Each structure stands twice: as structure tokens, then as C-alpha cells.
Design a protein with these regions (language model features):
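Beta-propeller blade termini and top-face loops
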Residues: 1-111, 118-121, 128-130
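Short acidic/polar inter-strand loop motif in beta-rich domains
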Residues: 57, 205-209, 237-248
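Contiguous beta-strand segments within globular domains
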Residues: 94-170, 196-198
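Surface-exposed coil/turn segments at beta-strand junctions on protein surfaces, enriched
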Residues: 116, 166, 190-192, 225-229
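Conserved aromatic beta-strand anchor motif in extracellular beta-sandwich/beta-rich domains
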Residues: 173-177, 236
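Short consensus segments that form the blades of beta-propeller domains
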Residues: 7, 161-165, 222-226
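Glycine-centered tight-turn motifs at strand-turn-strand junctions
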Residues: 182-225
Length: 248
């Protein structure tokens, strides 16, 4: 209802969108199965897209406004960080002591529950290509040779050890306050495409870092205090070999 070139289409095989007035179509595959969508509706106030499947409920794409800015030229960029909608600052309700998505407490397994949109500020970004590890880069180089039936060069022990010791790459979104002080680092997916990551408007948890293998099971993860209302900025970085490189 704002950009006449942005169209949505419900089909027998999912939902598609077009940024060219219908000349080309792209599938919206995040979080939806490959099923028919019989009806679509736009919630204008929240800029949400609702799709009904008539048999498996309905799905909601929260705040599709980043799609209005998508153009063929924009997708030529290596990375894109879209503008962030103002977040609402409040303390989320915790029914029956639950503070995790999907927690049913004592309601029983038959109690139906669907996840709500994540609390806080939602960041949307685009990656043209996946950020690969050294091992993944080597496999990508070797694939054409394997398909051609040729031998692949042996990497050698030094390279294999380096691959084994390499930390996984990550997208890191850095939140700063009005004084340019770092408030939070949030990791996001490194695969190609559009991604969303939410900041819960909190500082990091004060608890010391513990490896996952030694963490005790609990109903809730430790959290920091809420950041005060104000103006914050977010910066997109990629982390390779433990070093951050700012992208936007």
C-alpha cells in the first residue's frame, strides 16, 4: 500500500514477492513450509503480511518494510543493514514464571502455543554471499575438480590443522548508545540472504562465561539489566579468526 512495485502472491507452493511490479518473483521461504496459501492480507498499521493456509493455520511476516527498499541495484552490495523501527520499551509479561519462547510450564503438552515476535529492537540485514570457513572455502574450490573427475590437491597437515583450529565466522551486530559506547554484541547467521536478529534491549549478563558443555540446565538464561530509553545505533560487522571487521 506504499510501494506499488512491491507485490505479494500466494501460490500452491508458498508465498512469493516481487519488487518489479510482477516481472520477477522471489520466494519467501523463511519459517514457512511448502504448502498452499489461499489468502493474503496486509495489516497496514503494523506493516505486517498475514497468509492463511486453510488447514494449517496462518503465518505472519512482521514488519515487511525492508522489502520496500529492495532493488536489483541494492542486492549488488556485499552487505546491507536496513533501517530499524523504533522499539517499545517495557517489561514483558511472564505467565507462570515462563521467560522463554515455547515454555508451557504446567499447562501440559496439549496446550497450544505459538511464538510471539521477539521482544526488543529487530535488526534486518542482507548478505550477498555466505561467510565460509577455510574448510568450506577449500571444499568449494575442490567441487569443480570433483565434478570434472579430476584429482583434488591434498591440503597438507599444516592447512588441516589451521582449518581445525579456526573459529567459526560470525556476523556481529554492535549496539552503541548516544555516547558511542558499546552496549551489546549480538551474533547473527552467516548464510546468504535476508536475516533478522533481535536485541532484547538489555546489557550483557553479568555472569561469567562458561563453555556450553559445562553449563547447567535451567529454565532461563542469565540476562543483564534493561538499557535506559534513548537513541541507539547498530553497526554490522563480520568476525573472522576472532577479529571484527565493520561492514556498515
Amino acid at each position: 500500500h506504499v510501494n506499488s512495485n512491491l507485490l505479494f502472491l500466494g501460490t500452491e507452493f508458498g508465498v512469493f514477492f516481487s519488487i518489479s511490479g510482477g516481472n520477477t518473483w522471489i520466494k519467501l521461504s523463511g519459517g514457512t513450509p511448502n504448502i498452499p496459501f489461499r489468502d493474503l492480507a496486509i495489516q497496514k498499521r503494523e506493516n505486517d503480511l498475514v497468509g492463511a493456509t486453510f488447514g494449517r493455520g496462518f503465518y505472519v511476516l512482521d514488519d515487511y518494510t525492508p522489502l520496500r527498499q529492495v532493488t536489483a541495484k541494492l542486492l549488488e552490495n556485499e552487505t546491507v543493514l536496513f533501517p530499524v523501527r523504533d522499539a517499545r520499551w517495557y517489561v514483558p509479561k511472564r505467565p507462570l514464571g515462563c521467560d522463554k519462547s515455547g515454555c508451557k510450564s504446567s499447562q501440559g503438552a496439549a496446550y497450544f502455543q505459538a511464538p510471539n515476535p521477539p521482544f526488543g529492537a529487530t535488526f534486518t540485514y542482507y548478505l550477498a554471499d555466505q561467510i565460509r570457513t577455510r574448510h568450506e572455502q577449500r571444499l568449494k574450490r575442490e567441487k569443480p575438480l570433483q565434478e570434472a573427475g579430476e584429482d583434488t590437491p591434498y591440503p597438507g597437515w599444516a592447512e588441516l590443522i589451521t582449518e581445525g583450529l579456526e573459529d567459526d565466522p560470525a556476523i556481529v551486530l554492535t549496539v552503541k548508545n548516544a555516547s558511542d559506547e558499546i552496549i551489546r554484541h549480538i551474533e547473527g547467521p552467516v548464510t546468504a540472504g535476508f536475516h533478522r536478529v533481535a536485541w532484547d534491549l538489555r546489557y550483557p549478563a553479568p555472569n561469567p562465561w562458561v563453555p556450553k558443555a559445562k553449563r547447567q540446565q535451567s529454565r532461563s538464561d542469565p540476562v543483564g539489566v534493561l538499557a535506559e530509553p534513548g537513541t541507539y545505533t547498530v553497526h554490522l560487522n563480520r568476525r573472522i579468526d576472532g577479529k571484527l571487521q565493520e561492514l556498515n
